[in-house]
């Protein structure tokens, strides 16, 4: 049986989640037998987050890594820090901050499952083509569950947006 624990400060890890880096980490690392758990606070790009990362080392784990991330994303950070420089993450659609909870699970076959939940209460949403606006302060949520292979989205298992008087649900299968 093997176990170790350490508290780390000012940690930077390159290319940790989908090619993104974490910096300014204040992390606790625990290793027990064939798994490592990392917990703490860091910046993902310029977005302050709370992170729990589980890494399994065995030969046939159920999953290889799982990242649970929680943070507040300001409107401009979608593009500048997270690389989401496309609709609906642009200033034409989203204005204001969103509270985000994201779980990314990585498997040995290069598959990734992503579940993202956003609290849109403080976010203004604008759908100009539909002449629809959700004002800041009006409750709203968005959720997406998707499956990736490598860096490509293969399946959007489900997505929902419930905000004000708008309710959108769907799924999508991407072509190879």
Segments (PLM) and residue ranges:
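Interface amphipathic segments
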Residues: 13-116, 123-176
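Core structural elements
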Residues: 2-14, 122-123
